[in-house]
Amino acid sequence: MAGNAYSDEVLGATNWLKEKSNQEVFSFVFKNENVQLNGKDIGWNSYKKELQEDELKSLQRGAETTWDQSEDMEWETTVDEMTKKQVFIFDSLVKKCLFEVLNTKNIFPGDVNWFVQHEWGKDQGWHCHVLIGGKDFSQAQGKWWRRQLNVYWSRWLVTACNVQLTPAERIKLREIAEDNEWVTLLTYKHKQTKKDYTKCVLFGNMIAYYFLTKKKISTSPPRDGGYFLSSDSGWKTNFLKEGERHLVSKLYTDDMRPETVETTVTTAQETKRGRIQTKKEVSIKTTLKELVHKRVTSPEDWMMMQPDSYIEMMAQPGGENLLKNTLEICTLTLARTKTAFDLILEKAETSKLTNFSLPDTRTCRIFAFHGWNYVKVCHAICCVLNRQGGKRNTVLFHGPASTGKSIIAQAIAQAVGNVGCYNAANVNFPFNDCTNKNLIWVEEAGNFGQQVNQFKAICSGQTIRIDQKGKGSKQIEPTPVIMTTNENITVVRIGCEERPEHTQPIRDRMLNIHLTHTLPGDFGLVDKNEWPMICAWLVKNGYQSTMASYCAKWGKVPDWSENWAEPKVPTPINLLGSARSPFTTPKSTPLSQNYALTPLASDLEDLALEPWSTPNTPVAGTAETQNTGEAGSKACQDGQLSPTWSEIEEDLRACFGAEPLKKDFSEPLNLD
């Protein structure tokens, strides 16, 4: 910037603003409103009474001098004298209010930076902007300053009012000015407390960017917005003409512009968040994320898996409610984002699928005892657990005692984790524990009675609202139901009357699994890892848990009278060390089947099959051997399970073809 390019006044004002650019100051607005008292109109220009105090007269003369010196002689102003006089009086009254408050605080005026500008707005009319600040000012004093200035401003306005008012009317005018806050302070509303706090502005920036850019009013009455006159504590902008003011603003803007402008991109989520999170909120969110990740669904699980966070929340004020609400958010997140099938599948150890044998699982053995296609039954159950069964949203295990109903249901519920239990003893609120769950378990269901309609809605996967004890009603989203019973739940009795109209609707909502085969006493429980492995096996072998996949595999949607035995399960072969399908032919040896021929030893080695005979096995073909064939078969079954002769023959034909086998089988048996 060349030194002789601009006047000393312009450069002085620019440098002065740059020195004060980072000083924080209060921003006040002085105004008045049109008032009517007992038919007497008091407007913005009703305060032209001659001032009597010498200090006020001196301030008024200073305002007149500022107007004259800052007036641009290139065009003639048309602002009338009455408007000018009113502005001069307002200027003296505003400065008088400022000086009186400074005296109250024992602050020397020379230690304060201030700026005053009188303006006219299209909507607001006359108003005066005041910036004031210094080393003895703090943000907490802003509201106190506003109250004091409001009191002095109302008092001096009443003194300067040239309308003939009675003493009572003067008091009323002052009350109106104080109650309506004719002096306002720039504030902001805190997002958390919702309270107003003082908003400080930067002294130099506010003047250069806002006040100096406005146009001067040159007509009376004013047609457009603009400023009348301005003054400051440094006497730097008092006598600047409109063009010089704009030049100061431009020079200040150019000098204060940063060399590099850094841009930041704010995402919509950050804008929405918008507030500062407390440490407590951050801690709760972190804990909640860990609980969801570890699938914690009960206080007991929390105590065992995350004891530190549990103790931390328990020690806080209102810790019990905090624990309860946090756990409720966790279960709600799981219920809305995962299905019961998803929670089961994620527990599967996929590395063990290579050696996993589906027929060996206790669940499939129970189904196989009935001659069922256990793959088909498990596939149907998984579709319901994945909320893909449509209206048939309930898996019903029913039949006599000790047939395996509860152990299968218990294994599924344990694998899901987030399970709600129906409480038949709580007559008024039986579903109190069933909200925000991935699975509803109804153990030993009985007569539905008065609750039949509510049961039908939940069993069909509808969204309904239920009553809770001590709370308002709550919504249950579509949730799979698993149910066990020894009774015929399709027969509904209300009092002593049977209601047959409910029978078919109940059947339409159930996946009917009727177990009748009594299990031996040493059968044992279903392993906790069994159902995750079953689900993983089904997915790996193309049995997706969707009704479309089920229909593609088995032909149609299952109904109440579904025949689980059709189609038959293909008989697995070459499963060393695994049990055979219970509904295939009994285990046998060549002795029990009276075969005259046996494969060559080299063939057995090629097939990696262990021979069924031992050195103590009687020789085939003798009378002793024929009489003890049954005992030999039983001994073989009691020992390590071996392939049947029919299976070996089938494998040999697959490996060597029919012609070589025909030749081998035609040779006489040589047992030497």
Curated annotation (Swiss-Prot):
GO CC aspect terms: host cell nucleus
Domain called SF3 helicase: residue spans: 373-528
Location of the region described as Disordered in the Swiss-Prot/TrEMBL record: 613-643
Cofactor(s) essential for the protein: Mg(2+)
Cofactor binding summary note: The endonuclease active site can probably bind other divalent cations.
GO annotation, biological process: DNA replication; rolling hairpin viral DNA replication; symbiont-mediated arrest of host cell cycle during G2/M transition; symbiont-mediated perturbation of host apoptosis; symbiont-mediated perturbation of host cell cycle G1/S transition checkpoint; symbiont-mediated perturbation of host transcription
Active-site positions on this chain: 210 (for nuclease activity)
Short sequence motif named RCR-2, residue ranges: 127-129
UniProt feature, compositional bias: Polar residues: 613-630
Modifications the protein undergoes after translation, according to the UniProt entry: Phosphorylated.
Limits of the PV NS1-Nuc domain: 21-259
UniProt binding sites for a divalent metal cation: 119, 127, 129
Residue span of region DNA-binding: 1-276
Entry EC number(s): 3.1.21.-, 3.6.4.12
Keyword field contains Transcription regulation: yes
Top EC class, one word: hydrolase
Keyword Electron transport: no
MF-aspect GO terms: ATP binding; ATP hydrolysis activity; DNA binding; endonuclease activity; helicase activity; metal ion binding
Homology family: Belongs to the parvoviruses initiator protein NS1 family.
Domains: entry comment: In the N-terminus, the endonuclease region is involved in binding to the origin of replication. In the middle, there are the ATPase and helicase activities. The C-terminus probably contains a transactivation domain.
Primary role: Multifunctional protein which displays endonuclease and helicase activities required for initiating and directing viral DNA replication. Also plays a role in viral packaging and transactivation of several promoters. Binds site-specifically to 2-3 approximate tandem copies of the tetranucleotide 5'TGGT3' within the origins of replication (Ori), unwinds this hairpin region and nicks one DNA strand thereby initiating the rolling circle replication (RCR). Cooperatively binds Ori with host PIF and probably other host factors, which activate the nickase function of NS1.
Subunit (UniProt): Homooligomer; when bound to DNA. Interacts with human SYNCRIP. Interacts with host transcription factor SP1; this interaction allows high levels of viral P38 promoter transactivation by NS1.
Name assigned to this protein: Initiator protein NS1
Taxonomic lineage: Viruses, Monodnaviria, Shotokuvirae, Cossaviricota, Quintoviricetes
Protein encoded by which gene: NS1
